[in-house]
Amino acid sequence: MAPEQPARSGIDFSAFRDPKLARELIERIHELVGDRTINLMEVCGTHTVSIGRYGFRSIMPAGLKLLSGPGCPVCVTANRDIDHAIALANIDGAIITTFGDMMRVPGSSTSLAAQKAAGRDIRIVYSPLDALDIAEQNPDRPVIFMGVGFETTTPTIAAAILEAEARGLLNFSVYCAHKTTPPALRAIANDPETTIDGFILPGHVATITGLAPFGFLVDEFKTPGVVTGFEPVDILQGICMLVQMVVEGQPAIDNAYRRGVNADGNPVARQLVEQVFEPCDTTWRGLGPIAASGLAIRPEFSRFDARTRFDVPVEATVEPRGCRCGDVLRGAITPSDCPLFGRTCTPEHPVGPCMVSSEGSCAAYYRYRN
């Protein structure tokens, strides 16, 4: 029923937006679900936005719930990390660089955007390599890149650190808040307050990791997962495959995004990451501390590690009152269940990070709520 997956070059995307194919998949999903109750979770910010844009939640069977999980790297960044980055901005002469979505995320008492308005030198970059250029142009000033993201963006950070070493840019460093996806999925699967019957697995992440790191979902929890693309037919195909596995009681990890994802991912990118980073424990917003779910810069590259290089006082962490971003991120509630949603918390005046990021669950729900 789904379109044949062509070679990566010269892809004709029209097949993945075909209304007839989409209708057939929707009808099949309705047939399979019947009067069952099935909860599926996507764990990719792009899927969050796409599901909202295409209105898929409103056309699914009544018993099929599509939940948003911890797929937005900005959203899962803990308040403590935001506060630490703000503290680094107070270093004399420091230049803080980061991606645009991080600017408005509230910390315990302020944000990077507010600190920039107050006179701190905080700059938006589109790549860590831009931060390297800034470091080269300002050799007498510390330039710190605040790095957040999952497996997709980590290789570029590793490459930037290696390039900084090659260019002798010792004034460059990275505040690393990177995370890895599989441990978070294990935490959700173990959460007694959530019931997830299947995972719409992130296509972007899987381009790096391949399929193997998600195998534990089946081995340990008998829960299926399907790596899914981002076009309408991609997503519907992934949902249909998951529902069929749930109904038939045959869980597996499958790939519905073969034009973008190889089963073994990108070994070269993974090797680059392993050269520069090592696993560490880290805290996720909503999920709390998760063992070996973060990445720390290896000791041999410690001169580029802003965490160990700069000893700065960080204020006591305070979570925003009433904000339920954490519950949204673990699938315990939907954004509309939060009492602040659409009232005191809007994209113009966000209380929590899920309303700040363009890929945040709350921002997507708000934008496509009608």
Which sequence ranges carry the predicted segments?
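Metallocofactor- and cofactor-centric catalytic cores in central/energy metabolism, strongly enriched
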Residues: 2-140, 154, 158, 162-167, ...
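A conserved active-site cap/scaffold subdomain adjacent to cofactor or substrate pockets
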Residues: 175, 193-262
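Short catalytic-loop micro-motif centered on adjacent basic/acidic residues
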Residues: 40-42, 123, 144-147, 173-175, ...
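Secondary-structure boundary elements
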Residues: 137-141, 163-170, 191-195, 223, ...
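Internal helical hairpin/lid segments
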Residues: 236-327
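Flexible, glycine/charged-enriched surface loops at secondary-structure junctions
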Residues: 37-40, 171-172, 248-258, 284, ...
